[in-house]
Amino acid sequence: MDYEFLRDITGVVKVRMSMGHEVVGHWFNEEVKENLALLDEVEQAAHALKGSERSWQRAGHEYTLWMDAEEVMVRANQLEFAGDEMEEGMNYYDEESLSLCGVEDFLQVVAAYRNFVQQK
């Protein structure tokens, strides 16, 4: 999972992720927006889940982050619909709307993002 952190002309941090993980970048850009307290909450949840069968979820305005002890899923909230609403043969998966990755990989991106934000 490759990523890049940039600052726009106003100094706002933007995250770009490799193909297949774009929605993780959108989560940082739309939900985190340099809110390090949210990252603290996510890291604490990840540590609490380690070795357990439980899961944790944080719904945001545009994206929801879900994780268990091994995997993180970020999905666009617009994907919430009943299976009956899906047309025959249509797959709702869209790499811009859903992404899965390992917890350790995700926490590495969180740590790198935190370091980048603090370098102002």
Curated annotation (Swiss-Prot):
Coiled coil: none annotated. It comes from the Bacteria. InterPro entries: UPF0231. The gene is yacL. Pfam families: UPF0231. Belongs to the UPF0231 family. This is UPF0231 protein YacL. HAMAP family: UPF0231 (MF_01053).
